[in-house]
Amino acid sequence: MDRQPIISAKDVEITFSLRGRKLNAIRKCSLDLYEGETLAIVGESGSGKSVFTKNFVGMLDANGKITGGSIMFEGRDMTKFTEKDWLGVRGKKIAMVMQDPMTSLNPLKKIGKQIQESIEHHQGLKGEEAKKAAIEMLGKVGIPDPERRYEQYPHEFSGGMRQRVVIAIAAACRPQILICDEPT
């Protein structure tokens, strides 16, 4: 039996509307991702890597539109998903680590609570059990003294440490696919 990809994008085209004009941002982009595989999308700055991958979690900007192709996941075309469909996929099955950790974290909420919320929502753990799992995730991503750091706010972390927190939030969901948009 042939191996089937977890996700398969075929000839995806994305257009943006800007000041009454159409801008073709992605033209006939395709990929297949298989279980256990690491796949890198490489290109120049501004080449559309982020625009393309945001479609795997339903986060295309409001002025953007998929104008061609398909993205198949679990036998369904994601280009046809409604917001309700995305609620069952985003985070739980496919998670994404965005480029800028400061725009991914809530500056008014402690780091640990942000990870804990992800665990509670996607793993179904509650209270102390979820808190313990959040502290474990901080340790797994290399945050020293995770018990103390759990109680701190994003501004108390370096840029690299904030990025690791965002990775912890995404990984805590235990997704089938983890998309990392320049997670350095």
What is each model feature region?
Residues 77, 129-148:
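Conserved ABC ATPase "signature" region
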Residues 152-157, 161:
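Conserved ABC ATPase signature
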Residues 115, 167:
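Hydrophobic anchor residue at the start of the ABC signature
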Residues 165, 171-172:
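ABC ATPase C-loop
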Residues 91, 155, 173:
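Conserved signature/switch motifs of ABC ATPase nucleotide-binding domains
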Residues 66-77:
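Conserved ABC transporter NBD signature motif
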